[in-house]
């Protein structure tokens, strides 16, 4: 028999389910009664933290979901999102090896094929009056396998359409079914205009609810991104009514939500917006509110009055590196979020262990390393009693170190935690270096910049390089005549939008020697060595706040994901001042990148402000305080 393995990350003990089969509880995942901003699952307060594939695990028969679910469980993650009746065409959104774009012969959907050819990319058209039992067998097994590993499945019933190409793949499109429905434009399909089409949608919703209501590890989302593509919110409310009726508790069944008028056995969520929006007058059956690309975590802060779980349910479009998404996760969950789901492009068919080497222009990231880091975050949150836990930055009244942003999470009277990261939100930043360049010999020089992302260079008041765009690492060059010993003004500007950052300034001298422009050739006002370096939050230089000014001897920065607070420039003696009640405490610092503990200390405190030395100001740092 396989028992759960106990893993240690520094001072944290984490459970990794190594194929262990959990016995389902009587009630499905629901709202935590003591604090309905979080979940309860199998008798335990729960936060959902995951890094999941691109939603095609069921509709793509080429995808080995057992291997995929094993990987999530081994990494300490407990959620996955799956689209039940939607596919994309290859190349959509520039996604390589998209698991949601299966080949036609590997596609399986809820409806059976008819005897008539004509589906848009081959195969027979669909008969919307008949179910494909092989599909529902695959769906049930997927949810069962997830449940055995303690993984919660979000079953997404519909998705908006993004244009003609996404609409023409769907069985509801008039050319893809034999039932005479779907004779409408892509931005009119998810509406109440065609009662016959709506009837097929209703039947599909009831069928899925009937198939999945026996599982305790399922939540339902009505529609992915209904704020795009003409989705009618009256239609959205109608589907909520149909689903709520199909999930109405029977004799002896408990309600997962807290609605007096629309009790349901399972939670139903609304995908509210990209970024943030203030939720007002939600449908009474909706008990969970999800956002996409929710950084900074304003969606949580603006909707605390809902007293319901808030999720950051899709990430991406911020480069392929781990750092932006790791910071997004810690920020969002420390702000009081209940769900974080990173869209992980390292999972594709044939690479269900999450080791696909996607191209640099993939619209997001994902990696084994990031999943371990997110598993560490999940384990960290499990050390808190979520029934008593709230975000509370009052802990930080004493201020935070310069150039640093912080979120704080507090278990009343018992535990306090602070997450510190560079103040440059989303890890995006811009920089300007100014000074003078003094050549060693007269002649024609070639100036070279290596950058990822944008770069601009002026020498002696003339712009030589202008590549102010989001691009992969590349070199740009320009020539200029310089006179030995004669200093000329130099200005170099750069922005980092995500991914693997790099900035280098080199030259090829008249004798053909190519090198980084040496520190001895660069100076500031008054002839002082080095360039003035100014660093700004965001990608637009002075439009974002300046968070750091320093002297840089040369411009030779393989930033990677470290950003301008690169580890070589961090100050280990920085102090954080926190406000605590009287008591005896154990303080422990963690590095969420390694991830590991950085050490512990004990102290007694009479109450009030208390300075605590930061063990490491790295890309991110976490402090946990426990009152004994």
Identify the meaning behind each predicted range.
Residues 42, 458-461, 590:
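Short strand-turn-strand beta-turns centered on an Asx-Gly dipeptide
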Residues 325-425, 570-602, 613-628:
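Aromatic- and carboxylate-lined catalytic core of secreted/periplasmic carbohydrate-active enzymes
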Residues 402, 425-572:
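Acidic/polar, compositionally biased interaction segments
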Residues 476-480, 576-577, 608-615:
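Exposed aromatic-hydrophobic patches
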Residues 10-22:
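Bacterial N-terminal signal peptides
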Residues 34-285, 297:
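Active-site mouth of glycoside hydrolases
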Residues 24-26:
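Boundary at the C-terminal end of the N-terminal hydrophobic targeting segment
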Residues 281-354:
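Catalytic-core region of carbohydrate-active enzymes that cleave or remodel glycosidic bonds
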């Amino acid at each position: 028999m396989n028992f759960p393995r106990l893993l240690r990350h520094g001072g944290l003990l984490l459970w990794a389910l190594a194929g262990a089969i959990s016995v389902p509880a009587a009630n499905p995942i629901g709202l935590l009664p003591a604090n309905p901003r979080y979940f309860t699952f199998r008798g335990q307060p729960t936060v959902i933290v995951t890094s999941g594939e691109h939603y095609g695990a069921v509709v793509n028969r080429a995808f080995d979901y057992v291997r995929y679910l094993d990987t999530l469980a081994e990494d300490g993650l407990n959620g996955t999102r799956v689209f039940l009746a939607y596919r994309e065409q290859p190349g959509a959104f520039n996604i390589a090896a998209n698991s949601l774009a299966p080949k036609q012969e590997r596609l399986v959907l809820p409806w059976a094929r008819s005897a008539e050819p004509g589906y848009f990319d081959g195969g027979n058209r669909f008969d919307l009056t008949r179910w494909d039992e092989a599909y529902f067998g695959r769906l049930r097994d997927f949810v069962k396998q997830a449940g055995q590993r303690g993984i919660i499945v979000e079953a997404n019933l519909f998705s908006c359409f993004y244009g003609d190409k996404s609409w023409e793949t769907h069985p509801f499109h008039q050319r893809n079914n034999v039932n005479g429905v779907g004779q409408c434009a892509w931005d009119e399909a998810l509406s109440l205009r065609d009662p016959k089409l709506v009837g097929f949608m209703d039947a599909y919703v009831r069928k899925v609810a009937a198939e999945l209501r026996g599982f305790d590890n399922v939540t339902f989302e009505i529609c992915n991104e209904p704020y795009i593509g003409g989705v009618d919110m009256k239609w959205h409310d109608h589907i909520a009514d149909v689903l709520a009726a199909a999930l109405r508790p029977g004799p002896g069944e408990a309600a997962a939500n807290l609605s007096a008028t629309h009790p349901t056995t399972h939670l139903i969520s609304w995908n509210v917006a990209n970024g943030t929006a203030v939720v007002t007058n939600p449908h009474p059956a909706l008990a969970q509110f999800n956002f996409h690309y929710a950084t900074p975590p304003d969606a949580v802060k603006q909707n605390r009055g809902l007293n319901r779980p808030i999720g950051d349910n899709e990430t991406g479009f911020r480069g392929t590196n781990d750092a932006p998404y790791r910071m997004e996760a810690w920020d969002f969950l420390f702000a009081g979020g209940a769900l974080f789901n990173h869209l992980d492009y390292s999972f594709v068919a044939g690479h269900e262990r999450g080791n696909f080497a996607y191209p640099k222009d993939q619209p997001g990231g994902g990696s084994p390393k990031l999943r371990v880091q997110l598993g560490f975050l999940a384990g960290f949150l499990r050390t808190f009693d979520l029934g008593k836990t709230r975000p509370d930055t009052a802990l930080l009244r004493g201020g935070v170190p310069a150039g640093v942003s912080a979120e704080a999470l507090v278990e009343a009277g018992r535990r306090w935690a602070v997450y510190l990261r560079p103040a440059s939100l989303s890890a995006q930043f811009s920089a300007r270096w100014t000074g003078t360049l003094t050549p060693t010999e007269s002649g024609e020089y070639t100036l070279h910049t290596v950058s990822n992302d944008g770069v601009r260079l002026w020498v002696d008041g003339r712009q030589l390089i202008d590549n102010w765009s989001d691009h992969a690492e590349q070199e740009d060059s320009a020539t200029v005549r310089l006179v030995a010993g004669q200093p000329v003004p130099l200005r170099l500007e750069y922005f980092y939008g995500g991914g693997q950052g790099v900035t280098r300034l080199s030259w090829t001298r008249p004798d053909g020697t190519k090198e980084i422009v040496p520190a001895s050739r660069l100076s500031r006002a008054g002839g002082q060595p080095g360039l003035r370096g100014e660093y700004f939050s965001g990608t637009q230089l002075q439009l974002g706040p300046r968070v750091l000014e320093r002297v840089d001897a040369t411009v030779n920065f393989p930033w990677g994901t470290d950003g301008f607070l690169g580890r070589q420039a961090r100050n280990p003696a920085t102090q954080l001042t926190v406000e605590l009640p009287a008591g005896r405490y154990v303080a422990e610092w963690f590095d969420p990148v390694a991830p590991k503990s950085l050490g512990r200390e004990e102290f007694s405190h009479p109450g009030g402000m208390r300075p605590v030395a930061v063990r490491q100001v790295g890309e991110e740092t976490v402090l946990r305080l426990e009152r004994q």
